C-alpha cells in the first residue's frame, strides 16, 4: 500500500501543492501540475491502494485560495470512479 503525505504547513501556493503531489505520488516528469493532469495520473498512473494523509488541510486550503479544496475534490472523484484511495484529513 502506497502512502502519500501532504504537510499543509509547507504548502504556500498551488504550485507547491502540485510539486508535493508529484513527489509523494511518484508522478512522471511530464506531469502538467493542473487538475486535469492530476485526474489523468490518478486514473492511469498511480498504483493502488493509496492512502492520502493531508496534514493541516485547512491551512493549505487558505494559503492556496481554495486550490487545495479543488485538488481534494479530484481525489474524491477518482475514489468515486473506483480508485482505491483512503483520504485522511487532519
Swiss-Prot record:
<keyword id="KW-0963">Cytoplasm</keyword>
<comment type="similarity">
    <text>Belongs to the barstar family.</text>
</comment>
<dbReference type="Pfam" id="PF01337">
    <property type="entry name" value="Barstar"/>
</dbReference>
<protein>
    <recommendedName>
        <fullName>Barstar</fullName>
    </recommendedName>
</protein>
<dbReference type="GO" id="GO:0005737">
    <property type="term" value="C:cytoplasm"/>
</dbReference>
<comment type="function">
    <text>Inhibitor of the ribonuclease barnase. Forms a one-to-one non-covalent complex.</text>
</comment>
<dbReference type="InterPro" id="IPR035905">
    <property type="entry name" value="Barstar-like_sf"/>
</dbReference>
<dbReference type="InterPro" id="IPR000468">
    <property type="entry name" value="Barstar"/>
</dbReference>
Amino acid at each position: 500500500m502506497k502512502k502519500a503525505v501532504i504537510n499543509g504547513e509547507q504548502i504556500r501556493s498551488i504550485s507547491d501543492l502540485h510539486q508535493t503531489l508529484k513527489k509523494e505520488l511518484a508522478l512522471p516528469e511530464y506531469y502538467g501540475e493542473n487538475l486535469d493532469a492530476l485526474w489523468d495520473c490518478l486514473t492511469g498512473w498511480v498504483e493502488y491502494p493509496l492512502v492520502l494523509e493531508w496534514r493541516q488541510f485547512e491551512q493549505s486550503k487558505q494559503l492556496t485560495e481554495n486550490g487545495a479544496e479543488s485538488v481534494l475534490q479530484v481525489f474524491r472523484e477518482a475514489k468515486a470512479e473506483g480508485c482505491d484511495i483512503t483520504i485522511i484529513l487532519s
